Regions:
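Amphipathic alpha-helical segments used for helix-helix packing
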Residues: 91-112, 154-162
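Amphipathic alpha-helical packing segments from all-alpha helical-bundle domains
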Residues: 108-144, 166-177
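N-terminal intrinsically disordered/low-complexity leader segments
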Residues: 1-7, 18, 183-204
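Alpha-helical DNA-contacting segments of helix-turn-helix folds
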Residues: 20, 54-62, 104, 108, ...
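Amphipathic C-terminal alpha-helical segment
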Residues: 96, 146-164, 177-189
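Generic hydrophobic, amphipathic alpha-helix propensity
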Residues: 8-16, 33, 58-66, 70, ...
């Protein structure tokens, strides 16, 4: 049986992400995606046998989209500037794509593709923090940084915190200042070009 020429795994995922961003009341079903793509629902089962596999694919694609956005924002920055750019880009993405960010927090994919993606997250965060901390401290430092970013996202969106963006700038500066100047931090940080594999707290 020939499948419609417009149907592909990438097209299905792209449609699903668009639906998540339009209405995140619940994850898009295969039937709803089929209607969006004007194909029979059965045709989608050739790519995704069930919703769990579909949700995992959406999460991987969405997380990669977020990571790409952060990488572009960070660019070739180094040191403290790199940390500032990462924080601001993270918040900018969560503000621009709130439904997708919620979906990523509710769906944690496993498998080789997800593991490779999580390693990319580890690399960008390790690159930002490695000038300041030794590997054994890195997981706790990264967790602290991530907790601030996620917490500010929650306060701004769910509590509708007044002047949240200004408060975030202050909190971000205070936390980064504290971490960079901590007694546990390295003294006289230098870039070595080496990347140490750091397991992230949320990695599969």
């Amino acid at each position: 049986m020939a499948y419609p020429a417009k149907l592909s795994r990438a097209a299905i995922i792209q449609a699903a992400i668009k639906m998540v961003e339009e209405d995140a009341a619940e994850p898009p079903s295969l039937r709803a995606i089929a209607r969006r793509l004007h194909v029979a629902t059965n045709a989608l089962y050739n790519y995704f046998p069930d919703r769990s596999e579909l949700n995992a694919a959406i999460a991987v694609a969405g997380s990669r989209r977020m990571l790409s956005s952060l990488k572009r924002a960070v660019g070739n920055a180094e040191g403290r500037d790199e940390l500032d750019r990462f924080s601001k880009a993270f918040l900018r993405f969560t503000r621009t794509h709130p439904q997708l960010y919620d979906f990523l927090n509710e769906n944690h994919p496993t498998g080789q593709e997800a593991a490779a993606l999580f390693q990319e997250w580890a690399e960008i965060m390790n690159r930002a923090w490695s000038p300041f901390y030794l590997p054994e401290r890195m997981p706790k430092v990264i967790f602290t940084h991530a907790a601030l970013l996620h917490g500010m996202t929650t306060l701004e969106r769910l509590w509708q915190w007044r002047n949240a963006r200004g408060h975030f700038d202050f909190a971000n500066q205070m936390l980064l200042d504290a971490l960079v100047s901590s007694k546990h931090a390295k003294r006289g940080p230098k870039k070595t070009g080496a990347t140490v594999e750091i397991p992230l707290p949320w990695a599969p």
